[in-house]
Amino acid sequence: MALPIIVKWGGQEYSVTTLSEDDTVLDLKQFLKTLTGVLPERQKLLGLKVKGKPAENDVKLGALKLKPNTKIMMMGTREESLEDVLCPPPDNDDVINDFDIEDEVVEVENREENLLKVSRRVKEYKVEVLNPPREGKKLLVLDVDYTLFDHRSCAETGVELMRPYLHEFLTSAYEDYDIVIWSATNMKWIEAKMKELGVSTNANYKITFMLDSAAMITVHTPRRGLIDVKPLGVIWGKFSEFYSKKNTIMFDDIGRNFLMNPQNGLKIRPFMKAHLNRDKDKELVKLTQYLKEIAKLDDFLELNHKYWERYLSKKQGQ
């Protein structure tokens, strides 16, 4: 059962509507981090008590006997100033200095131990199909953080951090592609983000299913050691009658995520500093056109998505 809560912090009120009585105090703090930028360990939620003592992180919200729309005061400060929060973390070379995967592809993509891990995911990972795959449609796999959503900046609602033209992009893509969301977080937060952005409830398109970090595998690379990647083989193994290397494309801002299937990956420019770039970012407009162009093809393997803008410019100039 949903448990709406209003949290007051920094002179503003934040509405929390995606949690239930089965979620914990820590879940609430994690969600508040996405809204305010205050780390869970820095948060002090006044008034949350059990038997007269402050509620621990593992206490379920239902045990607090809160009435719907209860107002809670939060104390705590962000680690950085707002400008710092708007910037990517300084040690996050996933985005800034994402390594060139081309040198390591051959060693990783076909290594037997990695293929065995993919096979294990195909057998063991449970996919909840939200809408059935459609015959004859191609497959678009989308990352979330920095691809569809600026997850580092602070805002009152997720909509303020949504990448411009997201719904128009998904509406157009849905005409030719089944859409899958794959984020390197847990499913609870993927579902919360999709609800907050209005993706899971939009009437103009449907999400076929969503994958979380449990569908990923760890591979060893000579230069970077162990890294987590998103192997599309998990999807192809589970839905072989619909999807394959020939009809699948994946957008991600981190190139290493398609180390197991480099030819199917398109490295999108990360959407950061939403407050500054919301009016300038046109990435999804151009990618809408690219997806429409390549949807005419029978085999995506003849494409090099690294040069997608060049391909689009050439096609539009004909």
UniProtKB/Swiss-Prot annotation:
Compartment(s): Nucleus
General function of this protein: Dephosphorylates 26S nuclear proteasomes, thereby decreasing their proteolytic activity. Recruited to the 19S regulatory particle of the 26S proteasome through its interaction with 19S component PSMD2/RPN1. Once recruited, dephosphorylates 19S component PSMC2/RPT1 which impairs PSMC2 ATPase activity and disrupts 26S proteasome assembly. Has also been reported to stimulate the proteolytic activity of the 26S proteasome.
Cofactor annotation: Mg(2+)
Domain FCP1 homology: residue ranges: 133-294
GO biological-process terms attached to the record: regulation of proteasome assembly
Binding site for Mg(2+): 143, 145, 253
Modified residues (N6-acetyllysine): 117
A Pfam cross-reference name: ubiquitin
Source taxon at top rank: Eukaryota
This protein's GO CC annotations: nucleolus; nucleoplasm
PROSITE patterns for the chain: FCP1 (PS50969), UBIQUITIN_2 (PS50053)
Molecular function terms, GO-annotated: metal ion binding; proteasome regulatory particle binding; protein serine/threonine phosphatase activity
Record's protein name: Ubiquitin-like domain-containing CTD phosphatase 1
Keywords per UniProt: Acetylation, Hydrolase, Magnesium, Metal-binding, Nucleus, Protein phosphatase
Residues with PTM N-acetylalanine: 2
Name of encoding gene: Ublcp1
